[in-house]
Amino acid sequence: MPRSLKKGPFVDEHLLNKVDAQNEKGTKQVIKTWSRRSTILPDFIGHTFAVHDGRKHVPVFVDDSMVGHKLGEFAPTKTFKGHIKDDKKGRR
C-alpha cells in the first residue's frame, strides 16, 4: 500500500539539510549516506549520493527520472553471479 498523500514523502532530515546547504553554496560534492529509505525529491536532481549497500558506498547520480523513488533502489545489496550450468555430459 502506498504512503498517504497527506503525510508527504519521507526523507531523513539530516540528508535534506546537507542537500539544502550544498544548494545554497552552489557546490555539488558527493553526499555519503546510509539512508536507503529516503525518497528522492526534485531538490536532489544533479547531486551525487554515496548510498551504502551493506558493504560499500555505491555512487548514485540523481536525474529527473528518479524523483519519487527511494535511494536504496539504485544501490543493489545482492550480487547475482548467475545460475550454475547443468553439465550432464561430464557426470557420465
Swiss-Prot record:
Keywords: Ribonucleoprotein, Ribosomal protein, RNA-binding, rRNA-binding. InterPro entries: Ribosomal_uS19, Ribosomal_uS19_bac-type, Ribosomal_uS19_CS, Ribosomal_uS19_SF. PROSITE patterns: RIBOSOMAL_S19. GO terms for biological process: ribosomal small subunit assembly; translation. GO terms for molecular function: rRNA binding; structural constituent of ribosome. It comes from the Bacteria. One of its GO terms (cellular component) is cytoplasm. Protein S19 forms a complex with S13 that binds strongly to the 16S ribosomal RNA. PANTHER family: RIBOSOMAL PROTEIN S19P FAMILY MEMBER, SMALL RIBOSOMAL SUBUNIT PROTEIN US19M. Belongs to the universal ribosomal protein uS19 family. This is Small ribosomal subunit protein uS19. It comes from Corynebacterium diphtheriae (strain ATCC 700971 / NCTC 13129 / Biotype gravis). The lineage of its organism: Bacteria, Bacillati, Actinomycetota, Actinomycetes, Mycobacteriales.
